[in-house]
Amino acid sequence: MTTSLVLHPRWADTLMYVYEKSPNENNQNKSQTMEGLSGNCPATHCRDLMSHPALGRHSGTIATHQGSVYSDISSPDTGRQCPAPQTSSSASLSYGYPFGNPYYGCRLSHSHNVNLQQKPCSYHPAEKYAEPSSALPTEELSSRAKEFAFYPSFASSYQAVPGYLDVSVMPSISGHPEPRHDALIPMEGYQHWALSNGWDGQVYCSKEQTQSTHLWKSPFPDVVPLQPEVSSYRRGRKKRVPYTKLQLKELEKEYAASKFITKDKRRRISAATNLSERQVTIWFQNRRVKEKKFISKSKSSHMHTT
C-alpha cells in the first residue's frame, strides 16, 4: 500500500493515506472501508485523513472537523487516482511534503508495522489543499483555524518564549508514539517569526570593570604577590637601556660640533652608533635640557656667593 503524508507549514500535520491493492492481499479486508464511496473511489484505492501521531489526544478533534471541511469535495476526475502496480508483489508506504508546487515523496517497504486507522474513504485532489499564502474566506479560515490550530510545544514543561518556534521531531511510523498534550493556540493570533525585541536590538556592554586594587600580603617574605593580568596588556614605559661608552663618545663629539642636528647628520650618527634615529633625536633633546639646567644652576650659585 502507498501512503501520502501531507504537512502544512502553519497548520496541524495531517496524514493522507492511499491504499493500493496488491495482488497478494485479500479484498475482504478493505470491503468495509469502501462502503461510503458511492462509486467515486475504486476498490483498489482509498485515501484517508488522520491526525499526526505526535498530536496525541487531539487527533479526535481533527477527525470531527474534517468531515465539514472536505464534505463538498467530489472526485469526478478519476485520472488523478494512482493506479495500483500490476507487477509489484509487495506494497510500499510513501509520504511527501507539498511545500509549494513540487511534491517530494519517499517510500517505505510494507514490512514496517504501520498502524493505520480506517475511516470512510474520500478522494481529495491536490488543488483542494490551500497553501498558507493563498487567500481564504473568513468562514473557511475560522473553520480551518479550529481544525489546524495546533502549535507543537510542551505545555507544562517550560514557558513558551515569544519569537521562537518549537519544532517537534516526528516519531517513527513503525513505532507507537506516546500521546502528547500539545497546546491549542488560535490561528488568528499567530505571527510568523514575530520577535519581541528583534535581532538588531542594541546590547549595552559596560567597558568599565571594577578591579580589586588591594595588595595581598603574605606572612612569608619569600612569597611574591600576584599582579593582575591587565597590567601586562597596559602600555607602560620601556626599561631604560644605558648607552655604551663608544656611543656616548660619538654623541658627545657630534653635540660639541653642533647642538642641533640635521636629518643627514642624524642618519649618519644612527649608522655609526647602531642606534635608531629616534634615540639619537631624544638624546640630543635631553642633552640640551641637561646643559640648560647646568647653566641655570651655575648662575644661581654664582649669584648666591656674591
UniProtKB/Swiss-Prot annotation:
Keywords: Developmental protein, DNA-binding, Homeobox, Nucleus, Transcription, Transcription regulation. Residues 236-295 bind DNA. Sequence-specific transcription factor which is part of a developmental regulatory system that provides cells with specific positional identities on the anterior-posterior axis. It comes from the Eukaryota. This is Homeobox protein Hox-C13a. GO terms for cellular component: nucleus. The keyword Transcription regulation applies. Belongs to the Abd-B homeobox family. Residues 68-90 are annotated as: Disordered. One of its GO terms (molecular function) is DNA binding. The keyword rRNA-binding does not apply. It is found in: Nucleus. It comes from Takifugu rubripes.
